[in-house]
């Protein structure tokens, strides 16, 4: 009796799993950056005397990076909704333009669109604009997992930093300078990379003008 050989093709992984596998390598640079910044943020929040869970809560609900550094100090000051609103608007206004740029890209993905809009950070915006999912990978799930992984990196690193802040044997004074240092390095890299320094100078001038304008409004 002749036996017919049958070739059984292996089952393909679930579309979500394929998208997750494709998205993870795209987010490794973000993981490296968020790990350092998140640790600094968590240690900073802990040094202010706030609860260990606070940086994780703000990373989940606010997820605003530099805004979270400012909010941590605002929580210890006098209650001033107008000041908090103006400060948040000044820091995060760029996300209004991010959202406009991503309207078509995020269209048609149901509940995932709402989450991706909420959790769109600078780094996530950059990746989702430039990265292309491999063949056979659902684009919606691909962008969703990029967004989710980036936020998980930040929340986890902030929580770890807060936990370490409770046991660190040295003073954490000055750790809030980490964000200033990061933006200084970005400015210097931009200055060295481009022969034309117009964009770097604009990036330096705009925050200074906004700082003067918003501070004058706050103290009116």
Positions of predicted regions on the chain:
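Helix-loop-helix junctions within the multi-pass membrane cores of secondary transporters/permeases
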Residues: 12, 85-176
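Pore-lining transmembrane helices
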Residues: 15, 22-117, 153
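Hydrophobic alpha-helical segments embedded in the membrane of multi-pass proteins
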Residues: 36, 159, 174-186, 201, ...
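Conserved small/polar residues in nucleotide/adenosyl-binding loops
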Residues: 218-220
């Amino acid at each position: 009796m002749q036996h017919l050989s049958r070739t059984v093709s292996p089952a393909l992984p679930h579309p979500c799993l394929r998208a997750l596998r494709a998205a993870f390598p795209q987010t490794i640079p973000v993981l490296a950056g968020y790990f350092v910044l998140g640790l600094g943020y968590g240690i900073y929040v802990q040094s202010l005397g706030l609860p260990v869970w606070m940086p994780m809560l703000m990373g989940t609900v606010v997820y605003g990076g530099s805004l979270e550094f400012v909010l941590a100090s605002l929580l210890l000051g006098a209650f001033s909704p107008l000041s908090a609103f103006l400060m948040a608007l000044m820091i995060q206004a760029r996300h209004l333009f991010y959202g406009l740029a991503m309207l078509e890209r995020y269209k048609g993905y149901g509940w995932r669109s709402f989450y991706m809009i909420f959790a769109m950070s600078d780094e996530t915006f950059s990746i989702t604009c430039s990265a292309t999912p491999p063949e056979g990978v659902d684009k919606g799930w691909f962008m969703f997992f990029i967004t989710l992984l980036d936020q998980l990196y930040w929340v986890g690193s902030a929580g770890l930093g807060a936990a370490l802040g409770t046991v660190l044997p040295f003073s954490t004074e000055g750790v809030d300078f980490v964000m200033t240092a990061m933006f200084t390095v970005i400015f210097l890299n931009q200055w060295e990379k481009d022969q034309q320094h117009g964009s770097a100078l604009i990036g330096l001038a705009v925050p200074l003008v906004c700082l003067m304008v918003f501070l004058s409004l706050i103290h009116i």
